[in-house]
Amino acid sequence: MPQPPIAPLVPPAHVVDLMTVAGSAVFGARWKAKEAKLVECPALSDSMPEFKTTYDIDPHAELLGFDDSAWPEVAATELGAKRGGGMVSFFWFRSALTIPANAAGFATAGAKTVLTVNVDDYAEVWVNGEMPRAAGRPSPATIQGFNMPNRLVLRDTVTPGEKFEVAVFAINGPISAAPANFLWFREAKIEFYR
């Protein structure tokens, strides 16, 4: 599997904060959220004989076109609110983003476009049903570290009108040292580079 693109380390030409009403409106973003649960399921068929069960998450909201219409809507300004029951907990956040020709004063055509999210404590980020990753290589969509941002290149040269379906799987952790706190977004933004 090829190395996923890495976001630039230089300052962006323009940033839009998705945690504001105005910022989310630029992309037509409506955030939905739902708690995810660990559920017991049968072990894989080639597991060692002593393993009869294992665990999966429910729902699998990373799928492109996943129906989140019954999920509660979360105002952009409420993305930073504490969610989950604390300890080991999981939450899905979903939104569709449409790239405008003009993003709050910035002409977007041809710009490198990066989605940055920072979830307390960890996140996995799916875009259009894919989580770009490669074993043994930096993979910005996967867990980056304790309270570290995920910075995914959405497109090297974006075209106005392009749509991105984003699903963020938020994880409260460390899992083996269950914290007495909750999960929330520290930041969510779109960065443009020239």
Region roles according to the model:
Residues 126-151:
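Solvent-exposed beta-strand/loop surfaces of large extracellular or lumenal domains
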Residues 2-66, 71, 154-194:
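An acidic-aromatic loop/edge-strand motif
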Residues 67, 91-93, 121, 148:
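Residues that flank catalytic or metal-binding motifs in active/ligand-binding sites
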Residues 80-87, 94-96, 104, 140-141, ...:
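Beta-strand-rich interaction surfaces with strong enrichment in secreted/lumenal proteins
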Residues 86-88, 108, 118, 145-147, ...:
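Surface-exposed coil/turn segments at beta-strand junctions on protein surfaces, enriched
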